[in-house]
Amino acid sequence: MSDRDDSARKATVPRPLMAIAEQFASNVINFLTPSFRSPTRLVCPSDEAEQAVINAVTRAAVARGIPVEVIDLRPAPAERLNAITERLDGWVSRAAHSDSDPMPTLLILRGFDAFGDDTHDEPTYPFRSRFQFDRKFLWLFLGRDTLRMRFLFDSHSRPLYRAAGEITPEDWQH
């Protein structure tokens, strides 16, 4: 993205939203630093809020030398999550991890709430079995639907139960 595109995108986001996004970005990058690596999840109240968060988190990560990849799952959720699952090393990733490994990539997964019901959660089962041990990636799961995200991460019968910490700002929770 060029500086001009980024400036144009910033100009369209209301200032209070930018301030929230910038504060969030600072917190999430500190939270996701390689020594901790706890996956996180965030529910955004709007497309504008989501884009502001993505922009702010990307800037903060790049400033710390963390590569970032944004993947929009919404066009084909199952296929795209399966493709991500194939990239994961599972146990091998943990065994091969050493101080000389490259900086892990921050994966920002947009539209993760697509898996938030019984009819769409099948791809989350193989994903969890490999994702929980992966050390190549840092994780930020984004969604728009609070109930679906809670179903995914807070329901004890789901494969992603407690797999990512909730970091949605209080004023964005509904």
Which role does the model predict for each range below?
Residues 34-55:
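Walker A/P-loop nucleotide-binding motif
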Residues 167-174:
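Conserved small helical "lid"/interfacial subdomain of P-loop NTPases
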Residues 1-37:
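A short, basic N-terminal segment
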Residues 73-96:
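Short glycine-rich substrate-engagement loop in P-loop NTPases that contacts/grips substrate
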Residues 114-119, 127-156:
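Sensor-1/coupling segment of RecA-like P-loop NTPase cores
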Residues 32-35, 63-65, 94-102, 129-136, ...:
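Conserved catalytic network of the ASCE P-loop NTPase/AAA+ motor domain
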Residues 74, 95-120:
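Conserved P-loop NTPase "ATPase switch" module shared by AAA+ and STAND
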Residues 38-41, 59-77:
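Conserved catalytic segments around the Walker B and adjacent sensor/switch elements
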